[in-house]
């Protein structure tokens, strides 16, 4: 197809139809019948009453513009003005019905694909074809749509009827329109149940092969069948002339024709064995797609996010088992197709990354309290959550109470959503809740005891089978584990016997994060949006959640004795560039002097103010009285007055120092 041989409108319409060639839509037909009420004849052209609503007037003007722009200038149409006006009114009423049904379903018109064409048939007279569909449409909703459109269509026809009718006659006309179904839906009859079911059609094929091939009506009254005008959601066919419509149909047919046609022979026995999906199966599949799309992983989430489908299944025979099996398929789909890191990352609001500061998050502040490189720690955790840690498949937060272990683990588990919890109280089936999950959470882990081998297999990301209560054994696929504890879980005791042979294998399976800094009582919880933003920040800045990226950034794979403090982070909390940083003026804090020398109080000088944020490793830990490491204390301890005096003597000569000393005021 040569690009210069056809107009942009023709090529644009052809490509638009090709993009939507396989989109399934409903096919409706709007019509009216000749009615006689108490001697009053009401025909197809008896609905020319002036429309009062502004929206209907706007739709009518749009139909008039479409008619004028699509007329061929080479010949003049002889359709009379009354026929044109009737078609314009019908077009506005049909679109008004569609928009009202969309508003009841809270569907935006921009999310819907539709096509409307008014035609005249030799036997049927005037009728209007409507194709409509979108992502929120399902085959099971077809009959509901027909009923709603039938109600709105009958109501608006009565409103537009130009024949003088009494209130009782108007009600009767509306009843006739609803009972005779002046809005019909394309259906098919099931061979076994003998019931009618909605038949969806392919949007692009239906428009190109059927509607665009028809001739335009140019006489009044119409002698042959054809179309008056058409419009669509993409504004592609509205202004096309008859010849351009035929050209689009031909180009579409040529482009969509398969190069080779495979012929298959189906025997009568195979046809008999052919299985057609029931309405119930279609409904379950549609519901399952919505649950996976919205990441529903629990009955409570289902009740809150999809109450209609939950009630529909609950009302069916065996509804509880149906709910349980549907939810199990949903969690299995998420566990097999997504990692915990993927589920966290997709919740991130990337538009806020511009003003996002990693150092100001509560998680990184907890790590910074220990003098660690919080970027390195978060990068290692993300690698494990993305199943890239290899045998080291478990993130272990351990240390004293109130150091932030559980709040970090809770934030990660909440961001993942599809989480299974280890139940230590269930001695026989502790992993009953851990199948088909993206993350396993072990809270307050203790002595593994006789379950140590099963624990080691799960913590290393192996595929094992576990026993379930009241069921057979079930397989657990490689799943990341996040664990918190106050105890030394590397020491395994079975009965009264200590088993040291398990210590090193357990360490080889753990990402060791030892938290020792007690948090203040007003520290607060980690925000639910914090970890999605952390993951998005890491990806944006080149810290991919793979072990290859981790080794390229930090040199080696993390082990049990990993030094999280090296290399030093370039921008610390409350440093210049952070939102909590102090003003960049010369203060003792900017010179790494954390405390006021006690000698200044004896000299009656104004003491230095204590900084609001202590330097890591210099101030005693609250509640415990423990100090930081010896290296940090030596590097950042406060200078004494004698040391300052020695520095001053070194800066000035002895004569200058003596003359200046004689001029000092008497402080006593």
Curated annotation (Swiss-Prot):
Residues 571-592, 605-643 are annotated as: Disordered. Pfam families: NS1_C (PF12117), Parvo_NS1 (PF01057), PV_NSP1 (PF12433). Phosphorylated. Its cofactor is Mg(2+). It is an enzyme of class 3 (hydrolase). It comes from Parvovirus LuIII. In the N-terminus, the endonuclease region is involved in binding to the origin of replication. In the middle, there are the ATPase and helicase activities. The C-terminus probably contains a transactivation domain. One of its GO terms (cellular component) is host cell nucleus. Residues 609-641 have a biased composition (Polar residues). A motif (RCR-2) lies at residues 127-129. One of its GO terms (biological process) is DNA replication. Its main location: host cell. Residues 543-668 are annotated as: Transactivation. A motif (RCR-3) lies at residues 210-214. It is found in: Host nucleus. It catalyses: ATP + H2O = ADP + phosphate + H(+). InterPro entries: Helicase_SF3_DNA-vir, P-loop_NTPase, Parvovirus_NS1_C, Parvovirus_NS1_helicase, Parvovirus_NS1_N, PV_NS1-NUC. The active site is at 210 (for nuclease activity). This is Initiator protein NS1. Belongs to the parvoviruses initiator protein NS1 family. ATP binds at residues 399-406. Homooligomer; when bound to DNA. Multifunctional protein which displays endonuclease and helicase activities required for initiating and directing viral DNA replication. Also plays a role in viral packaging and transactivation of several promoters. Binds site-specifically to 2-3 approximate tandem copies within the origins of replication (Ori), unwinds this hairpin region and nicks one DNA strand thereby initiating the rolling circle replication (RCR). Cooperatively binds Ori with host PIF and probably other host factors, which activate the nickase function of NS1. A divalent metal cation binds at residues 119, 127, 129. Residues 21-259 form the PV NS1-Nuc domain. Residues 1-276 are annotated as: DNA-binding.
């Amino acid at each position: 197809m040569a690009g210069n041989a056809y107009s942009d409108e023709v090529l644009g319409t052809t490509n638009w139809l090709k993009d939507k060639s396989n989109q399934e839509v409903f096919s409706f037909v709007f019509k009216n019948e000749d009615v006689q009420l108490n001697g009053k004849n009401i025909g197809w052209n008896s609905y020319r009453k002036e429309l009062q609503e502004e929206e209907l007037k706007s739709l009518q003007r749009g139909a008039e513009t479409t008619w004028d722009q699509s007329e061929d200038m080479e010949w003049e149409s002889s359709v009379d003005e009354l026929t044109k006006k009737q078609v314009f009114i019908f077009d506005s009423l049909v679109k008004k019905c569609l928009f009202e049904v969309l508003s009841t379903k809270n569907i935006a018109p921009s999310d819907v694909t539709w096509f409307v064409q008014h035609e005249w048939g030799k036997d049927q007279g005037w009728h209007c074809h409507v194709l409509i569909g979108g992502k929120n449409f399902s085959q099971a909703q077809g009959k509901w749509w027909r009923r709603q459109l039938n109600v709105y269509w009958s109501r608006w026809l009565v409103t537009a009827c130009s024949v003088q009718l009494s209130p009782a006659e108007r009600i009767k006309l509306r009843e006739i329109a609803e009972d005779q179904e002046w809005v019909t839906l394309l259906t098919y009859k099931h061979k076994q149940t003998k019931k009618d079911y909605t038949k969806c059609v392919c949007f692009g094929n239906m428009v190109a092969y059927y509607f665009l091939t028809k001739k335009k009506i140019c006489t009044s009254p119409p002698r042959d069948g054809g179309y008056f005008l058409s419009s669509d959601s993409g504004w592609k066919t509205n202004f096309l002339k008859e010849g351009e419509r035929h050209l689009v149909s031909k180009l579409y047919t040529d482009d969509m024709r398969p190069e080779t046609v495979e012929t298959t022979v189906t025997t009568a026995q195979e046809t008999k064995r052919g299985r057609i999906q029931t309405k119930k199966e279609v409904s379950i599949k549609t519901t399952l797609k919505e649950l996976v799309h919205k990441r529903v992983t629990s009955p409570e989430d289902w009740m809150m996010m999809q109450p209609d489908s939950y009630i529909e299944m609950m009302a069916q025979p065996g509804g509880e088992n149906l709910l349980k099996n549907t939810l199990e398929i949903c969690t299995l789909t998420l566990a097999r197709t997504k990692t915990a890191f993927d589920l966290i990352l997709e919740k991130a609001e990337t538009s806020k990354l511009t003003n996002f500061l990693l150092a100001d998050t509560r998680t990184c502040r907890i790590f910074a309290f220990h003098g660690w490189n919080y970027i390195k720690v978060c990068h290692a955790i993300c690698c494990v959550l993305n199943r890239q840690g290899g045998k080291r498949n478990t993130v272990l937060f351990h240390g004293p109470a109130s150091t932030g272990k559980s709040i970090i683990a809770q934030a990660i588990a909440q961001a993942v959503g599809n989480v299974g919890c280890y139940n230590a109280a269930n001695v026989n089936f502790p992993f009953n809740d851990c199948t088909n999950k993206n993350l396993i959470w072990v809270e307050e882990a203790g002595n593994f005891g006789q379950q140590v081998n099963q624990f080691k297999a799960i913590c290393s990301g192996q595929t094992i089978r576990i026993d379930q209560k009241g069921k057979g054994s079930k397989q657990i696929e490689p799943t990341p584990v996040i664990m918190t504890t106050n105890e030394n879980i590397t020491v395994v005791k079975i009965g009264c016997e200590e088993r040291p042979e398990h210590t090193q294998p357990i360490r080889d399976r753990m990402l060791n994060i030892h938290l020792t800094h007690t948090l203040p009582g007003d520290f607060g919880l980690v925000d639910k949006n914090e970890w999605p933003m952390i993951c998005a920040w890491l990806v944006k800045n080149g810290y991919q959640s793979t072990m290859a990226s981790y080794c390229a950034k930090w040199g080696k794979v993390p082990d049990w004795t990993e030094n999280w403090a090296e290399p030093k982070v370039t921008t610390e909390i409350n440093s210049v560039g952070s939102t909590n940083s102090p003003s960049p003026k010369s203060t003792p804090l900017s010179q790494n002097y954390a405390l006021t020398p006690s000698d200044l109080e004896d000299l009656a000088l104004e003491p230095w103010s204590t900084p609001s944020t202590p330097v890591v490793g210099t101030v005693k830990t609250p509640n415990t009285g423990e100090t930081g490491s010896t290296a940090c204390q030596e590097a950042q301890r406060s200078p004494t007055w004698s040391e300052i005096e020695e520095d001053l003597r070194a800066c000035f000569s002895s004569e200058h120092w003596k003359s200046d000393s004689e001029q000092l005021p008497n402080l006593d």
